[in-house]
């Protein structure tokens, strides 16, 4: 296969096999980058439910960026119709991500009606950089988001931005992990790298 054919397979897999949920976001399936988002926080009896109905803000924000780049590549390759479809999908994904702004940050994931949203009352870092990079955050959102990331994620750890905020009233419970450890609020270089990229886009 050519590189373009391989990219098209991946693109179509996301749209046609993984699909989108009721909020227009990429479905969570077995999880996204953070396995603990499902396996660490969903009761064992409801994991199958969350996998079926869940939606990933992280994957959706990345798709908003990736589909736009892919669409531009298709146009440059002379595939006008396919390029237009990819660009339209990017715009739809961007709008779906933007709709989950809660006034302070973007939510993390939808786990189905029975379980609700993850990341509404606590700030999860993972989707935030990609919401900026993918264009879902407008200028006002960017400034609010940057301030909250600094105050709630950067200032609590000298080694970088933590994955999850915490306060006296609420902390996330992740099976088998202490607060501030690994996916349960630890510092991950990969996500901090995307954060640097995103923050560089803010005036």
Predicted regions and their residues:
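Carbohydrate-binding/catalytic loop surfaces
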Residues: 1, 23-54, 103-127, 161-188
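Short, glycine-/Ser/Thr-/acidic-enriched flexible segments
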Residues: 130, 136-139, 193-195, 201-203
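Catalytic cores of carbohydrate-active enzymes
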Residues: 62-172
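A generic structural motif
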Residues: 52-56, 69-70, 77, 202
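A structural signal for alpha-helical segments
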Residues: 2, 51, 58, 77-88, ...
């Amino acid at each position: 296969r050519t590189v373009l054919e391989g990219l098209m397979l991946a693109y179509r897999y996301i749209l046609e096999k993984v699909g989108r949920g009721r909020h227009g976001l990429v479905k969570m399936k077995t999880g996204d980058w953070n396995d603990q988002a499902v396996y660490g926080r969903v009761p064992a009896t409801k994991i199958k439910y969350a996998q079926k109905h869940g939606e990933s803000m992280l994957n959706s924000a990345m798709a908003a960026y990736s589909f736009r780049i892919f669409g531009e590549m298709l146009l440059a390759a002379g595939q006008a119709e396919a390029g237009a479809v990819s660009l339209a999908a990017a715009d739809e994904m961007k709008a779906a991500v933007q709709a989950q702004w809660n006034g302070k940050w973007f939510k993390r994931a939808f786990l189905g009606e029975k379980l609700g949203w993850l990341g509404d009352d606590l700030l999860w870092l993972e989707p935030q950089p990609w919401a900026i990079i993918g264009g879902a955050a407008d200028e006002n959102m960017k400034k609010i988001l940057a301030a909250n990331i600094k105050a709630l994620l950067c200032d609590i750890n000298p080694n970088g931005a933590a994955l999850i905020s915490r306060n006296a009233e609420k902390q996330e419970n992740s099976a088998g992990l202490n607060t501030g450890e690994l996916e349960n609020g630890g510092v991950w270089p990969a996500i901090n790298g995307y954060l640097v990229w995103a923050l560089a886009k803010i005036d």
